[in-house]
């Protein structure tokens, strides 16, 4: 935060001052107060001259020296000088530095851009800062981008990614320092360069060189910045004026407020030297000395620093780092305080944010083995000092206790604010900074930073706690920074990361990443996941890899393999055992948190390791951080530990801590920090244990339980915090994933509680988490988030992922993996959301994860996502098979519901997460589903990537997870509305709805629980219960959601409302389509691919295609999208899925409600009822159906419900009704609407039951809203659509063949693929379908859609209006059906048999078909049921693909999916589980389907 604060404050001032010319501006800036800037900026500036007392000074001195030497210019230059270094080699000292900088020089340009030239992070910041500063804010995105760009630079890019992140971190720190420009700038440069470039070392050296002493020192200093500080550092220490963050911030504020001309001037005027001297004295003395010595190893000791510095400077950073690492720990603790250390810490640390990041980056590169070390110092500084620490560093260093406290408070405030604002506020900063960097280069950087922070934090926090030096500072810092950061350390880095990740991911996904990049990232993620898995080795490594991969993967995408590699090695290695936990822990919180539990390993080595591992992970995967942090969020993202944000990862871990700490947890727990601490330990221990246990146990069940418990705990601890983050940010991704999981678990545990209250928060978080896992998550977003996420970015994801992965690989493998993956997706996935889920998702989010989706798709797809998606249903079913899974589901739904409900973003996370969690767990049961989950993945990344993504994710998650999320997704959708999403979810759902949802959710959970039980038992019971719950909840939901949402949301649906409603329902679908389209399409494609490939490979191309499609789709979708765009995306994703999700959620509810949903729709009930009747029949079918319902409607709970109720109404529903229900329900509102719309629109439902239903259906159902337009028509339209669709779909469609089938059958295109069979269940020629070209080319598919649209046109009109897309959707659907998706759809429909009924019902058939198909289906279904199951499974798979299409219809899709190629896949899938998953998937797919389906459908 401090950094943030600085960043925010200082950067602004700086920005203001420096915004102008990066190089000059800073200079100018500095120049204004050349010495001053130097001085003020360099705390050490004054002493800087001297020795630049303290490495800081040194660094700063570097700047300072140069600055000082350079003089004003030096300062300016120094500050900027470093920048200058970067920017202008001309600075005399800088020149030297430049020498150091040369790379910098080269970096220089980049530096500027790269900020990463952490070299001058500060400088960069200064120089680059202008942009940087702007970027500071943008930093995450930009930084990330930069990172992305910078990625080119091995270290710079990466580091700089990190660096920038760092820079953000750094920047703030740098800013602070930069504010104290010279200080950090130089320090950063030193460190930054050194670390980053290692130039800093050189630079330090160089700058030092100019300094003479500094040079001498500098060499040392370079080594540690401290070196400079070391030699001169100590003395300079006397003079080193360390700026406290407070001071820097104050100065920045003053500048901003216009009280001061420049920060430097302000400092000159206002900074009491006594204080400075005093502070440095105090901390420096203790710190410098200790640090010095330890640090000495690092930078502090000049002698050691020298060596280390050189190492750092070289690539030895690791060496230096390692040496430093240990010392760093001390050093870190000390460093920040020590001037030298501070220098190191500050310089390095301060720099670190830049530098450490850089170093970290570097280190990470070196993998830093001690990123912590070299970066450690930096990290340390950063983490310790920078984290808070640079500020701390600087601040700490120069800070008096009072100042520290003040700063701490300020930081805390900032953090809180950020947390609130950002996915993971805390996380975000780091996330922003390191995560961003980490995210970009960030992973490494971030990892390092987190490592730094974690190390620092751990060291700082821990160590600091341990050490007096840092005790105070650390505490201050720790609390303020490290602790926060401690928690945040990991979190910030992680959280940040998560968030950043989520955000980044989102951003990346969106901003930085192109879908391709995202896809790449996904691939990377996958790659890393594999790699890591191998690399990591199974448990630990499994986890870690996953986590890393996932976390990292998400992020990894960013910090791709190389850095990751490096890091991972480090990471894994150090982290290996510890890291096991690390990853897990990382996941866990941070692993910092875990760290504490495993302080020894973690901290010392592990810490670093964690840092590396974690950090590495972080480094490696930003995601790890994300995961770890976001997810380590972020997250995942991840997650969560984003998401996760994850936004992820961050979310997860971070979320946990941060969020927990800051947010939910805080609310939940006494103090975030306290809670965090407790949690951390507890959690860590527990989690470690739990995680490990699960890991070790590997027992799915156990793992599941454990994980769940662990998650619950962790999540609870983390989750809430996460949650908020998630909610707030994509981080939710990560966080929520946790939340989700937590939610799931917790939901399980206390559905009502969690569900309602906590859950709402938590749940939201949970959902967010889920989604986050993505923000994921998630997501953010991640991001938040993301994410984290978003991380999620993620935590859950991460957690899931980590542990899951860990577990998964170990025991939980499938599920956990799936879950993790899903989470990962989510988290990462964050996410930010950070994604924020919006993210974060979005991530995360948590973070439109197109890319995320990609990875997720790949990842999740293969694993978690599907599972997640299906998990609830599927997983549960498969896993627990109903029982366990169901249970899982049960919780899931609750979690889902409430959480989903609660959070849109969280939804994403939560819904998703819960899905993930629950599902995941369940998923585990059906890992295959996991694949399907891909969508989830998509979803995950979706959230991660973006809101939409996040939402997508959400939807997906929700969809998959839970309709709940769906609702949430709508929220998220809206939210991507991240917050909105949460809100939205609730909100759209209508608060009431959502609330109800919560209610529902609660009920859902209740029913879930009940249903779970009941469901299984009494489908009806479930039906009842769900209906009941659902009704009340769902119905409410529906109503509210549908109605309300429909009205409101629905309206929104049309437009924004659509978002909610639509978002909820249709929007979700439709515009989910939109967003989802990307993801959806991606997912769709993905799914298709999945379907086709089930392997991610296609995914990539597919992904690309999907992207293209999406592009096209989006365009196509746009209408819808516009309507629901925002929401749609998220919602689409979320809603689509969301719809599915919400509907699922609701649907869930609805599905659960199925009857309810149906009820809601009324028609649906029809459908449902028939389905129910059918259901019963189909109970077997029900299974499928449930699946379907689940898949389709329930997606999550409904799925559950349905699924649960497989027999239950849901069953019915599920199969067909459910499908419709699902669709309807899914859209619940939409789908629910669909239900009725779906029912009616069954056609629509059929057509796009999910989709159009959503839309139309949703619209229709929610006719209220949409229905307005299409409401009447909608339903009719839906019917029409359904009919049209159906008609179109199959004129034959009617009963004979499921409409879908008929349609499909009729569909010429489909006809090739699908053949009617006596059973009435169409057979699909997967070979034809699978190509997933169509899905891939949703476009194509659309075109088909278009073809059919005419038919559907009428409906289309409404639909069209509804979304044309709807019509198109419908047509699309049918066309889709026909067209691949068409098939899917048609298939879906037809395939639905089990679900098809649903599908059909959904198709529009639902009602009809629901009725007929229902009946028909029943018969058909029944047989098909098995078939369906398989088919469903296939479908599912297909649905994965088709499902995408089917998203909304995921459920339908399910059928559709069935229809689609996936039938086989469906088989593939667990069949019904798959199918469920399909549904889920679909839901998840929702994004796919929703987006895809919906998008497709709609679009």
UniProtKB/Swiss-Prot annotation:
Identify residues that carry N6-acetyllysine. Answer: 36, 108, 110, 137
Which InterPro entries does the UniProt entry name for this protein? Bcl-9/Bcl-9l, BCL9_beta-catenin-bd_dom, Znf_RING/FYVE/PHD
Q: Where would I find the Glycyl lysine isopeptide (Lys-Gly) (interchain with G-Cter in SUMO2) crosslink on this chain?
A: 1344
Q: Could you tell me in which tissues this protein is expressed?
A: Expressed in breast, ductal and invasive ductal carcinomas of the breast, sporadic colorectal adenomas and carcinomas (at protein level). Expressed in fetal brain. Expressed in lung, amygdala, eye, prostate, pancreatic and prostate cancers, head and neck tumors and embryonal tumor.
Q: Which residues carry this modification: Phosphoserine?
A: 21, 25, 88, 116, 118, 424, 750, 813, 915, 926, 938, 942, 947, 975, 987, 991, 997, 1004, 1010, 1017
Q: Can you say where in the cell this protein is located?
A: Nucleus
Q: Which GO terms describe its molecular function?
A: beta-catenin binding; transcription coactivator activity
What are the start and end residues of every segment in region (Disordered)? 1-238, 271-500, 888-1084, 1116-1201
Q: What positions are modified (Asymmetric dimethylarginine)? A: 680
Provide an example Pfam family for this protein: BCL9
Does the record bear Phosphoprotein in its keywords?
A: yes
Q: Does the keyword Transmembrane apply?
A: no
Q: How does it assemble?
A: Found in a complex with CDC73; CTNNB1 and PYGO1. Interacts with CTNNB1.
Anything noted about its domains?
A: Tne C-terminal domain is important for its transactivation activity.
What is the documented function of this protein? Transcriptional regulator that acts as an activator. Promotes beta-catenin transcriptional activity. Plays a role in tumorigenesis. Enhances the neoplastic transforming activity of CTNNB1.
According to UniProt, the name of this protein is B-cell CLL/lymphoma 9-like protein
| Source organism of this protein record | Homo sapiens (Human)
């Amino acid at each position: 935060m401090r950094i943030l604060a600085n960043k925010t404050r200082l950067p602004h001032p700086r920005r203001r001052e420096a915004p102008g010319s990066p190089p000059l501006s800073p200079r100018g800036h500095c120049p204004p107060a050349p010495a001053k800037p130097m001085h003020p900026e360099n705390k050490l500036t004054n002493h800087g001259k001297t020795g630049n007392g303290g490495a800081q000074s040194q660094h700063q001195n570097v700047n300072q020296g140069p600055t000082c030497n350079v003089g004003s210019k030096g300062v300016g230059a120094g500050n900027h000088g470093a920048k200058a270094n970067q920017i202008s080699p001309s600075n005399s000292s800088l020149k030297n530095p430049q020498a150091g900088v040369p790379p910098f020089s080269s970096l220089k340009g980049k530096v500027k851009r790269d900020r990463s030239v952490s070299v001058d992070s500060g400088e960069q910041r200064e120089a680059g800062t202008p942009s940087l500063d702007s970027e500071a804010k943008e930093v995450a995105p930009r930084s990330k981008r930069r990172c992305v760009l910078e990625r080119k630079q091995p270290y710079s890019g990466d580091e700089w990614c990190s660096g920038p992140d760092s820079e953000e971190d750094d920047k703030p720190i740098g800013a602070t320092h930069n504010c104290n420009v010279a200080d950090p700038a130089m320090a950063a440069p030193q460190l930054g360069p050194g670390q980053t470039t290692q130039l800093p070392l050189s630079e330090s050296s160089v700058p030092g060189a100019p300094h003479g002493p500094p040079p001498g020192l500098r060499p040392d200093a370079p080594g540690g910045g401290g070196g400079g500080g070391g030699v001169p550092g100590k003395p300079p220490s006397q003079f080193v004026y360390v700026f406290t963050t407070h001071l820097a911030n104050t100065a920045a504020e003053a500048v901003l407020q216009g009280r001061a001309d420049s920060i430097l001037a302000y400092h000159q005027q206002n900074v009491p030297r006594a204080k400075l001297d005093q502070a440095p004295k105090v901390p420096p003395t203790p710190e410098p000395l200790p640090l010095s010595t330890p640090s000495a190893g690092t930078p502090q000791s000049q002698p050691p620093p020298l060596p280390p510095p050189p190492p750092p400077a070289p690539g030895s950073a690791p060496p230096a780092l390692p040496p430093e690492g240990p010392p760093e720990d001390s050093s870190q603790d000390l460093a920040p305080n020590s001037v030298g250390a501070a220098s190191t810490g500050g310089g390095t640390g301060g720099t670190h944010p830049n530098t450490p990041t850089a170093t970290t980056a570097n280190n990470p590169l070196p993998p830093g083995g001690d990123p912590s070390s070299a970066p450690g110092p930096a990290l340390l500084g950063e983490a310790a000092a920078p984290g808070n620490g640079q500020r701390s560093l600087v601040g700490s260093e120069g800070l008096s206790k009072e100042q520290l406290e003040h700063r701490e408070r300020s930081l805390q405030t900032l953090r809180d604010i950020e947390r609130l604002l950002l996915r993971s506020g805390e996380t975000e900063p780091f996330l922003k900074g390191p995560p961003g960097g980490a995210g970009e280069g960030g992973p490494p950087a971030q990892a390092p930073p987190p490592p730094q922070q974690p190390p620092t934090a751990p060291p700082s926090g821990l160590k600091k706690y341990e050490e007096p030096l840092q005790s105070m500072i650390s505490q201050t810092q720790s609390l303020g920074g490290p602790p926060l950061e401690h928690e945040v350390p990991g979190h910030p880095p992680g959280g940040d990361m998560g968030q950043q990740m989520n955000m980044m991911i989102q951003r990346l996904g969106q901003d930085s990443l192109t879908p391709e990049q995202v896809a790449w990232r996904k691939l990377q993620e996958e790659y890393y996941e594999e790699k890591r898995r191998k690399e990591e080795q199974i448990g630990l490594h499994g986890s870690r890899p996953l986590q890393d991969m996932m976390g990292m993967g998400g992020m990894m995408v960013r910090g791709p393999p190389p850095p990751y590699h490096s890091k991972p090695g480090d990471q894994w290695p150090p982290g290996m055992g510890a890291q096991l936990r690390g990853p897990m822990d990382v996941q866990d919180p941070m692993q910092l948190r875990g760290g504490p539990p495993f302080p020894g390993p973690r901290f010392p080595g592990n810490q670093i390791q964690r840092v590396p591992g974690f950090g590495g992970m972080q480094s490696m995967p930003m995601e790890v951080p994300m995961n770890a942090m976001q997810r380590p969020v972020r997250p995942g993202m991840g997650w969560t530990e984003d998401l996760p944000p994850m936004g992820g990862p961050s979310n997860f871990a971070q979320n946990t801590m941060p969020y927990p700490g800051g947010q939910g947890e805080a609310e939940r727990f006494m103090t975030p920090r306290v809670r965090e601490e407790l949690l951390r330990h507890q959690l860590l221990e527990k989690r470690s244990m739990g995680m490990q246990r699960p890991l070790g146990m590997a027992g799915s069940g156990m793992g599941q339980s454990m994980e769940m418990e662990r998650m619950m705990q962790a999540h609870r601890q983390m989750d809430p915090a996460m949650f908020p983050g998630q909610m707030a940010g994509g981080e939710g991704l990560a966080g929520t994933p946790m939340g989700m999981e937590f939610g799931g678990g917790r939901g399980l545990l206390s559905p009502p509680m969690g569900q309602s209250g906590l859950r709402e928060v938590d749940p939201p978080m949970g959902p967010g988490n889920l989604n986050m896992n993505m923000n994921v998550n998630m997501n953010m977003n991640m991001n938040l988030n993301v994410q984290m996420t978003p991380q999620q970015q993620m935590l859950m994801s991460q957690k899931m992922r980590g542990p899951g992965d860990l577990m998964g690989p170990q025991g939980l493998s499938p599920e956990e993996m799936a879950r993790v993956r899903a989470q990962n997706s989510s988290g990462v996935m964050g996410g930010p959301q950070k994604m924020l889920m919006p993210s974060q998702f979005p991530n995360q989010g948590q973070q439109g994860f197109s890319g995320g989706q990609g990875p997720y798709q790949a990842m999740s797809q293969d694993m978690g996502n599907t599972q997640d998606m299906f998990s609830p249903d599927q997983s549960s079913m498969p896993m627990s098979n109903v029982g366990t899974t169901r249970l899982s589901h049960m919780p899931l739904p609750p979690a889902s519901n409430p959480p989903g409900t609660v959070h849109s973003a969280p939804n994403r996370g939560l819904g998703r997460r819960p899905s993930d969690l629950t599902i995941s767990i369940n998923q585990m049961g059906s890992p295959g589903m996991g694949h399907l989950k891909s969508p989830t993945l998509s979803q995950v990344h979706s959230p991660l990537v973006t809101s939409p993504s996040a939402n997508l994710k959400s939807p997906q998650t929700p969809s998959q997870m839970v309709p709940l999320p769906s609702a949430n997704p709508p929220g998220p959708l809206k939210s991507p509305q991240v917050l909105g999403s949460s809100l939205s979810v609730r909100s759209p759902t209508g608060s009431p709805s959502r609330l109800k949802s919560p209610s529902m959710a609660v009920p859902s959970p209740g029913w879930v629980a009940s249903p779970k039980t009941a469901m299984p038992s009494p489908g009806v019971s479930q039906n009842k219960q769900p209906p009941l719950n659902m009704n009340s909840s769902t119905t409410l939901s529906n109503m509210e959601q549908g109605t309300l949402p429909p009205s409101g949301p629905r309206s929104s649906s049309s437009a924004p409302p659509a978002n909610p409603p639509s978002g909820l329902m249709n929007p979700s679908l439709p515009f989910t389509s939109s967003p989802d389209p990307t993801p959806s399409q991606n997912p769709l494609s993905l799914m298709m691919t999945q379907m086709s490939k089930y392997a991610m490979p296609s995914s990539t191309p597919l992904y690309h295609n999907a992207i293209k499609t999406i592009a096209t789709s989006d365009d196509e979708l746009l209408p819808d999208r516009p309507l629901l765009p925002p929401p749609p995306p998220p919602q689409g994703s979320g809603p689509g899925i969301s719809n599915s999700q919400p509907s699922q959620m609701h649907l869930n509810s609805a599905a659960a409600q199925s009857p309810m949903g149906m009820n809601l729709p009324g028609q649906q009930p029809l459908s449902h009822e028939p389905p129910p009747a059918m259901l019963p029949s189909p109970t077997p079918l029900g299974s499928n159906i449930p699946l379907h319902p689940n898949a389709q409607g329930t997606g999550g709970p409904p799925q559950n419900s349905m699924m649960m109720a497989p027999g239950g109404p849901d069953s019915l529903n599920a199969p067909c009704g459910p499908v419709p229900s699902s669709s309807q329900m899914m859209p619940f509102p939409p789908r629910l609407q669909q239900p009725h719309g779906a029912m009616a629109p069954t056609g629509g439902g059929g057509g796009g039951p999910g989709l159009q239903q959503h839309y139309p259906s949703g619209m229709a159902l929610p006719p209220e809203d949409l229905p307005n337009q299409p409401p009447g028509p909608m339903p009719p339209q839906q019917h029409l659509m359904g009919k049209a669709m159906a008609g179109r779909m199959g004129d034959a469609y009617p009963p004979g063949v499921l409409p879908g089938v008929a349609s499909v059958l009729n569909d010429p295109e489909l006809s090739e693929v699908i053949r009617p069979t006596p059973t009435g269940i169409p057979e699909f020629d997967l070979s034809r379908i699978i190509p997933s070209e169509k899905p891939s080319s949703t476009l194509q598919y659309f075109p088909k859609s278009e073809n059919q649209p005419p038919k559907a046109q009428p409906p289309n009109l409404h639909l069209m209006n509804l979304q044309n897309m709807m019509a198109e959707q419908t047509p699309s659907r049918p066309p889709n059906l026909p067209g691949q998706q068409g098939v899917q759809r048609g298939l879906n429909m037809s395939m639905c048999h089990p679900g098809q009924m649903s599908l059909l019902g959904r198709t529009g058939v639902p009602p009809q078909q629901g009725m007929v198909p229902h009946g028909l289906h029943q018969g058909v279904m029944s047989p098909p049921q098995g078939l369906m199951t398989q088919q469903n499974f296939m479908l599912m798979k297909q649905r994965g693909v088709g499902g995408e299409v089917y998203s909304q219809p995921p459920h339908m899709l399910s059928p559709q999916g069935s229809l689609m190629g996936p039938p086989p896949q469906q088989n593939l899938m667990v069949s019904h589980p798959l199918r469920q998953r399909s549904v889920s998937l679909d839901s998840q797919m929702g994004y796919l389907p929703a987006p895809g389906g919906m998008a497709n459908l709609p679009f």
